[in-house]
Design a protein with these regions (language model features):
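Transmembrane helical cores of multi-pass ion-transport proteins
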Residues: 2-619, 623-630, 634-653
Length: 653
């Protein structure tokens, strides 16, 4: 009855249901793989890689098995990046590559402590609001015409990104860009988004494609992509600028602890900052040409920029208002700025080489950059954000009624620090240590000795191109974890200074400009301004070409000023190469001995089986002979006596 009533009351609804596409009861393989491809990768990849172990069951090949699985999981993100990075903790001890204690120790090294401490100091800067004051003040100095404002935003973003994470820097600058663009739009200088298209539907004027997000104008894309690219490029300037730098530095230091060419804080900056400035400026020029009509005065974009130039006072008004809202510089900001400067100075003067550093004056223990970083972090908790409590002593003004907060709180750190990076970086360090200890890295390096036919410059260009291509589709840190250990051993096999390949490759891992998934800054601005992947892919062509060419040229020129022995194969590298060669020979000998032992066991087993078969055949022949003898002998005796059982039987019958 209810069913009939439904048909009568809701005939249109029923008709719509009947007109809809029928639901298929049988699953389609396409839908299955579309929804469950990650599970298929996680399940099938360990099985597909098993022939590596069956081919040669040695620690080197077992480590290669783990490496390939982790590489696929990292690139496809079939498992979360941080979960994939935990695999060595389980795989290395159970597969006889490294012990649990040794493996877990690689997850918390000096480089990792320095990185986490650097993030905490950057959060202290953010907590105090010092970063906003710095950004707005620099923009005031640079100017507020559209081109100069864009240049100012890019340079400020680049500088801040040298000291804090790229994602945090982009997240901080995006609201500033949004406020500037909104004020410019309110004054009629520019538009943030294109006007929606309308169409006639049922006699009414309705928006076309109402579900689509607003499409940003070229000016909007120029500003947002500028800060995203500047964040990635600025992170290349210092060791603490991005996790990628600390990753390849940590892997290099672990592989070559006796190297005389170190990646200390000052040397790293001298190496990378000049090239960083060049490709940041060239990227700005490209974005201006691509989006804002630079050198194309008759284009629509150039005419809009000219209107904005005539109304530069509007943007200046916005920046001035924002800066005024911050008020006077607080004691909180002053203390954080002083501590930040102290940390940078301690980095530079720890062990500069050109004069005696403060670490040289202390007892003969190795002091690395984690010490000044954590020292500043501790001071941020020890110093108060203000000194209002002194009114208890001076008896002037109202006394505080609550405890005075420190320069930063642990609650703020706990909620803002990306703790998963501990495992992501640590997994790379563990993989590098396991590949070295098992001999896998030496095996891969020696297998690439055929690349000796290439000139060093051509080989360097290939390495940079491979790194840039890989980082466009995967996490920067994951690519560095995969690529750098291989380059370490390849350089030893080819008799090349490892720094010649490792340093450029590590920097190239940060040069991801094409896709939102390439790096967090790209994803942030793509979501913030609704930038399409197609537009970002096209805009990223220019920065990619610029960074590849600039980095290659600087590695052939400026890098040799910083590291004069870059063209030579240093003594420490020769020692490392000999150790790697000995390890490779040892592994080959072990593999050969195991092969010989297997062959001997097989031949011994075959001989035993043959002997057993011979014994069985001989025993069978003897048994038949005995049976025949036992039968024929009585018959012969009966025949001799003149009787036969058969004749007797016939006679009786």
């Amino acid at each position: 009855m209810a069913k009939e009533t439904t048909k009568m009351i809701y005939p249109d609804f029923k008709m719509e249901l009947e007109a809809a596409e029928p639901v298929e009861t049988r699953p389609r393989w396409g839908n299955f793989f579309a929804n469950h491809w990650k599970g298929c990768v996680v399940f099938l990849m360990p099985l597909l890689c098993l022939p590596i172990i069956f081919m040669n069951n040695t620690p080197a090949y077992r480590c290669m098995y783990v490496l390939l699985i982790m590489a696929v999981f990292w690139v496809t993100e079939a498992l979360p990046l941080y979960v994939t990075s935990m695999i060595p903790i389980v795989a290395f001890p159970t597969m006889g590559i490294m012990g649990s204690e040794e493996t877990c120790m690689t997850y918390f090294k000096d480089t990792l402590v320095m990185f986490m401490g650097g993030i905490m100091v950057a959060l202290a800067v953010e907590y105090s609001g010092l970063h906003k004051r710095l950004a707005l003040r620099v923009i005031q100095i640079v100017g507020c015409s559209p081109r100069r404002l864009h240049f100012g935003l890019i340079m400020v973003t680049m500088f801040i990104s040298m000291w804090i994470s790229n994602a945090a820097c982009t997240a901080m600058m995006s609201p500033i860009v949004q406020a500037v663009l909104e004020e410019l739009q309110s004054q009629g200088v520019c538009k943030i988004y294109h006007e929606p298209e309308y169409q006639m539907v049922g006699g009414k004027n309705k928006k076309k494609n109402e579900d689509e997000l607003p499409y940003p104008t070229k000016v909007t894309q120029c500003y947002y992509l500028g800060i995203a690219y500047a964040s990635s490029l600025g992170g290349c300037g210092t060791i603490i600028g991005t996790a990628t730098n600390l990753t390849f530095k940590g892997i290099y230091d672990s592989a070559f602890p006796n190297a005389t060419e170190k990646m200390d804080f000052a040397t790293f900056m001298f190496y990378s900052v000049p090239s960083m400035l060049v490709y940041t400026v060239l990227t700005y020029v490209f974005l201006q040409w691509h989006f804002m009509g630079l050198w194309r005065p008759k284009s629509k974009e150039a005419q809009e920029v000219q209107v904005g130039k005539d109304n530069a006072h509007v943007a200046k008004k916005v920046i001035d208002q924002r800066y005024k809202e911050l008020g006077k510089m607080s004691i909180h900001e002053i203390q954080v700025m002083i501590l930040f400067i102290i940390m940078v100075l301690m980095y530079f003067t720890r062990k500069p080489g050109i004069f005696t550093g403060w670490a040289d004056l202390l007892p003969s223990k190795v002091i690395k950059n984690s010490m000044p970083t954590i020292f500043v972090v501790i001071m941020c908790f020890m110093l108060p954000a203000n000194y209002a409590f002194l009114r208890y002593c001076t008896r002037r003004g109202p006394v505080p009624t609550a405890p005075t907060s420190s320069l930063i709180t642990w609650k703020f750190i706990q909620t803002r620090v990306p703790w998963g990076l501990v495992f992501l970086l640590g997994g790379g360090f563990a993989l590098a240590a396991g590949s070295k200890q098992s001999g896998m890295a030496s095996l891969i390096g020696s297998s690439m000795s055929g690349l000796k036919v290439l000139p060093n410059a051509a080989l360097l260009l290939v390495v940079i191109l491979v790194a840039v291509f890989m980082t466009a589709f995967s996490s920067n840190v994951a690519v560095a974890n995969i690529l750098v250990p291989v380059l370490n051993e390849m350089s030893l096999a080819l008799k090349i200074n490892p720094l010649y390949l490792v340093f450029p490759a590590g920097l190239a891992c940060s040069m991801a400009f094409h896709l939102p998934v390439s790096t967090p800054p790209n994803a942030l601005v793509a979501g913030y301004a609704h930038i399409r992947s197609k537009d970002m892919a096209i805009a990223g062509i220019g920065p990619t070409i610029i960074t590849i060419i600039t980095l290659f040229i600087f590695c052939q020129t400026w890098a040799k000023v910083i590291y004069p022995s870059l063209d030579t194969f240093p003594e420490w590298a020769q020692i490392a190469a000999e150790e790697a060669a000995n390890k490779t020979r040892h592994l080959s000998a072990v593999a050969a001995s195991k092969t010989i032992e297997f062959a001997a066991n097989a031949s011994r087993l075959l001989a035993n089986n043959t002997e057993l078969v011979n014994d069985l055949s001989t025993g069978s022949s003897n048994l038949v002979s005995n049976i025949l003898a036992n039968i024929t002998e009585p018959l012969a005796q009966l025949a001799a006596n003149g009787t036969h059982p058969l004749t007797d039987l016939a006679f009786k019958n």
